[in-house]
Amino acid sequence: MATRAPLAPPPNETEASVSRITREGKKLTYKLNVMQQPERARACGAGAKSSADRRPVDPPPVVELRVYESDPNDDLNKTDITFAYNANFFLYATLETARPMAQGRFAPNPTCPVLTGVPVAGVAYLDRPSQAGYFIFPDLSVRHEGVYRLNFHLYEETKESKDANENAPIQSMSNPMPSKPMAPKSFLEFRLEVVSVPFTVFSAKKFPGLATSTSLSRVIAEQGCRVRIRRDVRMRRRGEKRTDDYDYDEERVYRSSDRISTPDTHGYAGTPVERPRSTSTSTVDPSFPYGVDAQRRSSGATEYGFQGAQPYQRPLPPAPGPAPAAVSTPAPPAPPAPPSHNPGYQSHLSFGSTQTQYPAPQLPPTPQTASTLAAPYSPHPSYSHARNPSTSAEYETPGYSYPPSRMSTERSSYPKNGLPPLRLEPPKPLNMPSGEPRSSDPNAYHSVAQSAAPRSQTPSSSLVPSLPPLKALSGDYPNNLSQSSSSTSQSPSHDLGAGKKFFWDTGASLSKRSYEDSFGHDDRPLYNGMRPDTESYPRRLSDASRNFYNETRDEMAYKRANGRMATKISPALQ
């Protein structure tokens, strides 16, 4: 079967010319040349946003116009009068398919125009690339994909009567100098038509991209015409990887990587990447328990307004294997020493790990020793709290991640006389009343600590089921534990004056305190116009608060509006 021969190009493709005789008997020749052919375009669609989303034909079509004058009997001697010819020229562009389609039997449905944009261009007289008139179409878009041609129709508006057609009536010419403004009576004459070569309109998925602007577009843009100039290649590379010589800024990649990387401040090879703190202590990495900011964190005493000593830290030997969770005890105030972190120390609770923060007033914190791990709540916020449940035992035996015999031997090597005496308060037994004042004598505290240490060796196995067997503990463990507990306190020394007590009741209790015991009535919200001194407002204080007011603040003094001073008993004690 014979294949169909390709369609022959039209005779007016790319170039076309036409001649006419003027009223004065001169011959004018019009010549159109499509200097820049359209090559590709992306379909802009027919949706609601197609008019705003322009996809111009690339490169923009450029048509050159030249006008020649000659004698009707001598076509060889022509004179270029493009710049001297006094007339207005317009070029109108239309779109047609490259392969004509047969008409169907039924009438086609009415469709919107396929060509959008600005299809009309006026002549621009430019000196480069040569002296001629140019028509530029920088804003032509096609709605649907396919293969098309552009038809350019030239229209002329003559301004002088001598340039009219030979058979044109005289009255049809307009007066060049009207006496008063009036509607124009001039009209346009169609001169000739030229078509472009076929070009392809791609869909958005298949569009290869825009190429660099041509030299002709640059020359035209330099002379003041509106042409979009692209100095970089925007062609898609399908199936190829990006190379270093194609739009790749190596320095920009380095800058972005430096901006998101976290430097290793300690130089550990096995240091994990630091992550945000969480409120759970079970997710702390045992190989790096202290964190990066442990050496910069101040003690709880510094948070309350007075300076605390630097915690003493020393490198510990690596653990032989996994062991139950250990409870960290505060370090004693000692001369500043360079902090060192040991990645081999196995612990789930430490100073650098997460800490439970409780709102509390600025009051002196109470120390917490190793023998009172289940002591009642203290407003000091910088202690690590154990997660092991405790029902009613006041003293618990802490678990360690290495054999206690080695720990007792190492702790016995601490200097015993290098630390200043501390005025600490001994823990209260369960049968001691909560309102009894604390003793500030360090000798009494030392004796109580010596007597309380043996109790920690014999707790009930039902209360602490997760502790290691007690038979592994050495005989000198209680003495060393009491000695180390007194030397591992983090709170600074705080001396209470005679006759003064803590405002908050820090005695032992087996249940949580109520809201009224923890906070005064000044902290309660006021509703429905309630005032602190009204009868409908609760004024109940804790026992410790009442004792404090009875001893130091039985009467309150205030100034009246008339300037007179008045005193009365505090309403909280009535």
Curated annotation (Swiss-Prot):
Swiss-Prot/TrEMBL domain comment: The C-terminal PEST domain is a region rich in proline, glutamic acid, serine and threonine residues that is required for the light-dependent regulation of development and secondary metabolism.
Gene: veA
GO CC annotation, single: nucleus
Protein species of origin: Aspergillus flavus (strain ATCC 200026 / FGSC A1120 / IAM 13836 / NRRL 3357 / JCM 12722 / SRRC 167)
Localization of this protein: Nucleus; Cytoplasm
Region spans: PEST: 457-498
Name of the molecule in the record: Developmental and secondary metabolism regulator veA
Domain Velvet: 25-230
InterPro entries in the record: Velvet (IPR021740), Velvet_dom (IPR037525), Velvet_dom_sf (IPR038491)
Family: Belongs to the velvet family. VeA subfamily.
Keywords: Cytoplasm, Nucleus, Sporulation, Transcription, Transcription regulation
Signal peptide: none
Region of interest (Disordered), residue spans: 1-22, 39-60, 255-500, 513-540
Keyword Oxidoreductase among record annotations: no
Gene3D superfamilies associated with the record: Velvet domain
Induction / repression: Expression is positively regulated by laeA.
Biased composition (Pro residues): 314-323, 330-341
Regions of compositional bias (Low complexity) in chain numbering: 459-474, 482-493
Quaternary structure and interacting proteins, as annotated: Component of the heterotrimeric velvet complex composed of laeA, veA and velB; VeA acting as a bridging protein between laeA and velB.
Pfam family, one: Velvet
Protein purpose: Component of the velvet transcription factor complex that controls sexual/asexual developmental ratio in response to light, promoting sexual development in the darkness while stimulating asexual sporulation under illumination. The velvet complex hat acts as a global regulator for secondary metabolite gene expression. Controls the expression of the cyclopiazonic acid, aflatrem, and aflatoxin gene clusters. Controls the expression of the sclerotium-specific pigment asparasone A gene cluster. Controls the expression of the aflavarin gene cluster.
Phenotype on disruption: Impairs expression of aflR and sclerotia production. Prevents metabolization of host cell lipid reserves and is inhibited by oleic acid in growth assays. Blocks the production of aflatrem and aflatoxin; and strongly decreases cyclopiazonic acid production. Down-regulates transcription of ps27, a polyketide synthase gene belonging to the asparasone A gene cluster. Down-regulates five genes found within the aflavarin cluster. Results in a reduction in transcription levels of oxidative stress response genes after exposure to hydrogen peroxide. Alters the starch-degradation profile.
Comp. bias regions, Polar residues: 343-353, 385-394, 406-415, 448-458
